[in-house]
Protein backbone atom coordinates (compact mmCIF):
# COMPACT_ATOMS: atom_id res chain seq x y z
CA UNK A 1 0.00 0.00 0.00
CA UNK A 2 2.85 2.41 0.78
CA UNK A 3 4.02 2.28 -2.84
CA UNK A 4 0.53 3.06 -4.11
CA UNK A 5 0.10 5.96 -1.72
CA UNK A 6 3.50 7.37 -2.66
CA UNK A 7 3.19 6.92 -6.41
CA UNK A 8 4.78 10.33 -6.97
CA UNK A 9 8.34 11.39 -6.48
CA UNK A 10 9.14 13.47 -3.40
CA UNK A 11 9.41 16.54 -5.65
CA UNK A 12 5.92 16.00 -7.11
CA UNK A 13 4.40 15.37 -3.66
CA UNK A 14 5.87 18.69 -2.49
CA UNK A 15 4.46 20.43 -5.57
CA UNK A 16 1.02 18.98 -4.82
CA UNK A 17 1.38 19.68 -1.09
CA UNK A 18 0.63 15.98 -0.52
CA UNK A 19 1.42 14.50 2.88
CA UNK A 20 -0.17 11.18 3.68
CA UNK A 21 -1.81 10.45 7.03
CA UNK A 22 -1.02 7.32 9.06
CA UNK A 23 -3.96 4.90 8.97
CA UNK A 24 -4.30 4.81 12.77
CA UNK A 25 -4.82 8.59 12.84
CA UNK A 26 -7.26 8.61 9.92
CA UNK A 27 -9.26 5.85 11.64
CA UNK A 28 -9.50 7.77 14.93
CA UNK A 29 -10.64 10.86 13.04
CA UNK A 30 -13.21 8.89 11.01
CA UNK A 31 -14.60 7.18 14.10
CA UNK A 32 -15.02 10.60 15.78
CA UNK A 33 -16.54 12.40 12.79
CA UNK A 34 -19.01 9.80 11.51
CA UNK A 35 -22.04 9.44 13.76
CA UNK A 36 -24.72 7.82 11.60
CA UNK A 37 -24.72 5.16 8.85
CA UNK A 38 -26.44 7.69 6.56
CA UNK A 39 -23.80 10.44 6.93
CA UNK A 40 -22.60 11.86 3.61
CA UNK A 41 -18.83 12.29 3.77
CA UNK A 42 -16.52 14.41 1.63
CA UNK A 43 -12.75 13.99 1.36
CA UNK A 44 -11.61 17.05 -0.66
CA UNK A 45 -8.05 15.84 -1.36
CA UNK A 46 -8.26 12.04 -1.15
CA UNK A 47 -4.81 11.23 -2.57
CA UNK A 48 -3.91 7.67 -1.57
CA UNK A 49 -7.48 6.96 -0.32
CA UNK A 50 -6.45 6.47 3.31
CA UNK A 51 -9.31 8.53 4.72
CA UNK A 52 -11.79 6.91 2.32
CA UNK A 53 -10.73 3.49 3.63
CA UNK A 54 -11.09 4.64 7.24
CA UNK A 55 -14.49 6.17 6.56
CA UNK A 56 -15.65 3.00 4.84
CA UNK A 57 -14.63 0.99 7.92
CA UNK A 58 -16.32 3.44 10.32
CA UNK A 59 -19.53 3.37 8.31
CA UNK A 60 -19.62 -0.43 8.25
CA UNK A 61 -19.00 -0.58 12.00
CA UNK A 62 -22.14 1.49 12.63
CA UNK A 63 -24.34 -0.49 10.25
CA UNK A 64 -23.97 1.08 6.81
CA UNK A 65 -24.61 -1.59 4.18
CA UNK A 66 -23.03 0.17 1.18
CA UNK A 67 -20.50 2.77 2.38
CA UNK A 68 -19.54 3.84 -1.16
CA UNK A 69 -22.99 5.44 -1.48
CA UNK A 70 -21.98 7.82 1.32
CA UNK A 71 -18.42 8.65 0.21
CA UNK A 72 -17.51 11.58 -2.02
CA UNK A 73 -14.14 12.94 -2.99
CA UNK A 74 -12.12 15.43 -4.96
CA UNK A 75 -8.52 15.36 -6.06
CA UNK A 76 -6.50 17.37 -8.54
CA UNK A 77 -4.21 14.45 -9.35
CA UNK A 78 -5.00 11.74 -11.90
CA UNK A 79 -2.78 9.30 -9.96
CA UNK A 80 -5.16 9.63 -7.01
CA UNK A 81 -7.97 8.50 -9.32
CA UNK A 82 -5.86 5.59 -10.55
CA UNK A 83 -5.40 4.54 -6.91
CA UNK A 84 -9.14 5.00 -6.25
CA UNK A 85 -10.00 2.72 -9.19
CA UNK A 86 -7.50 0.07 -8.04
CA UNK A 87 -8.94 0.03 -4.53
CA UNK A 88 -12.66 0.33 -5.28
CA UNK A 89 -13.10 -0.57 -8.97
CA UNK A 90 -16.69 -1.56 -9.69
CA UNK A 91 -17.93 -0.15 -6.36
CA UNK A 92 -17.24 3.42 -7.44
CA UNK A 93 -20.09 5.80 -8.04
CA UNK A 94 -18.58 8.12 -10.65
CA UNK A 95 -20.58 11.24 -9.83
CA UNK A 96 -19.25 10.99 -6.26
CA UNK A 97 -15.64 11.66 -7.30
CA UNK A 98 -14.41 14.73 -9.15
CA UNK A 99 -11.02 15.27 -10.78
CA UNK A 100 -10.41 18.94 -10.01
CA UNK A 101 -8.89 21.37 -7.56
CA UNK A 102 -11.29 21.37 -4.57
CA UNK A 103 -11.24 25.18 -4.58
CA UNK A 104 -13.12 25.04 -7.92
CA UNK A 105 -15.77 22.52 -6.80
CA UNK A 106 -19.15 23.21 -5.17
CA UNK A 107 -21.72 20.97 -3.43
CA UNK A 108 -24.04 21.17 -6.45
CA UNK A 109 -21.31 19.45 -8.50
CA UNK A 110 -22.09 16.30 -6.48
CA UNK A 111 -25.84 16.74 -6.83
CA UNK A 112 -26.37 17.29 -3.10
CA UNK A 113 -26.68 20.36 -0.90
CA UNK A 114 -24.23 19.59 1.88
CA UNK A 115 -22.31 16.99 3.86
CA UNK A 116 -22.47 15.78 7.45
CA UNK A 117 -18.71 15.12 7.49
CA UNK A 118 -15.71 16.67 5.77
CA UNK A 119 -12.50 14.84 6.54
CA UNK A 120 -8.94 14.71 5.35
CA UNK A 121 -5.48 16.17 5.14
CA UNK A 122 -5.53 19.29 2.95
CA UNK A 123 -2.55 20.27 0.80
CA UNK A 124 0.14 22.43 2.36
CA UNK A 125 1.24 24.88 -0.32
CA UNK A 126 2.21 28.42 0.56
CA UNK A 127 0.60 31.24 -1.38
CA UNK A 128 3.86 32.16 -3.10
CA UNK A 129 4.20 28.57 -4.41
CA UNK A 130 0.68 28.44 -5.86
CA UNK A 131 0.03 28.85 -9.55
CA UNK A 132 -1.59 32.05 -10.76
CA UNK A 133 -4.84 30.12 -11.33
CA UNK A 134 -4.79 28.71 -7.79
CA UNK A 135 -4.23 32.15 -6.28
CA UNK A 136 -7.14 33.58 -8.30
CA UNK A 137 -9.40 30.70 -7.22
CA UNK A 138 -8.38 31.21 -3.58
CA UNK A 139 -9.12 34.94 -3.83
CA UNK A 140 -12.59 34.10 -5.16
CA UNK A 141 -13.21 31.63 -2.30
CA UNK A 142 -12.17 34.33 0.15
CA UNK A 143 -14.35 37.01 -1.47
CA UNK A 144 -17.42 34.75 -1.67
CA UNK A 145 -17.21 33.20 1.79
CA UNK A 146 -19.61 34.29 4.53
CA UNK A 147 -17.04 32.90 6.98
CA UNK A 148 -14.09 34.99 5.86
CA UNK A 149 -11.90 36.81 8.29
CA UNK A 150 -9.88 39.92 7.73
CA UNK A 151 -6.66 38.06 8.43
CA UNK A 152 -6.77 35.40 5.70
CA UNK A 153 -4.89 36.76 2.74
CA UNK A 154 -1.56 36.81 0.95
CA UNK A 155 0.32 34.90 3.66
CA UNK A 156 -2.16 32.03 3.89
CA UNK A 157 -1.38 28.49 2.87
CA UNK A 158 -3.69 26.51 0.61
CA UNK A 159 -4.94 24.53 3.63
CA UNK A 160 -6.48 27.77 4.99
CA UNK A 161 -8.47 28.31 1.80
CA UNK A 162 -9.46 24.62 1.76
CA UNK A 163 -10.83 25.01 5.27
CA UNK A 164 -12.65 28.22 4.42
CA UNK A 165 -14.14 26.65 1.27
CA UNK A 166 -15.10 23.46 3.16
CA UNK A 167 -17.32 25.51 5.45
CA UNK A 168 -19.66 26.10 2.49
CA UNK A 169 -20.07 22.30 2.13
CA UNK A 170 -20.81 21.36 5.73
CA UNK A 171 -24.32 20.82 7.04
CA UNK A 172 -25.34 22.64 10.21
CA UNK A 173 -24.06 20.58 13.16
CA UNK A 174 -21.79 18.65 10.80
CA UNK A 175 -18.21 17.77 11.67
CA UNK A 176 -14.93 18.69 10.05
CA UNK A 177 -11.96 16.50 10.95
CA UNK A 178 -8.71 17.61 9.36
CA UNK A 179 -5.03 17.14 9.90
CA UNK A 180 -3.67 20.68 10.09
CA UNK A 181 -0.13 21.96 10.54
CA UNK A 182 1.03 23.38 13.85
CA UNK A 183 0.89 26.84 12.22
CA UNK A 184 -2.88 26.55 12.70
CA UNK A 185 -2.24 27.34 16.35
CA UNK A 186 -0.14 30.44 15.83
CA UNK A 187 -0.39 31.81 12.27
CA UNK A 188 -1.93 35.25 12.17
CA UNK A 189 -4.25 34.22 9.34
CA UNK A 190 -5.49 31.20 11.35
CA UNK A 191 -6.96 33.32 14.16
Where do the protein language model's features map onto the residues?
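Class I S-adenosyl-L-methionine
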Residues: 1-63, 69-87, 91-92, 106, ...
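SAM-dependent methyltransferase catalytic-core segment centered on the flexible catalytic loop
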Residues: 7-12, 16-17, 49-53, 57-65, ...
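A general structural motif
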Residues: 37-39, 68-69, 94, 112-115, ...
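Generic beta-strand hydrophobic packing signal
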Residues: 71-73, 96, 118
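Conserved SAM-binding strand-loop segment of SAM-dependent methyltransferases
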Residues: 92-102
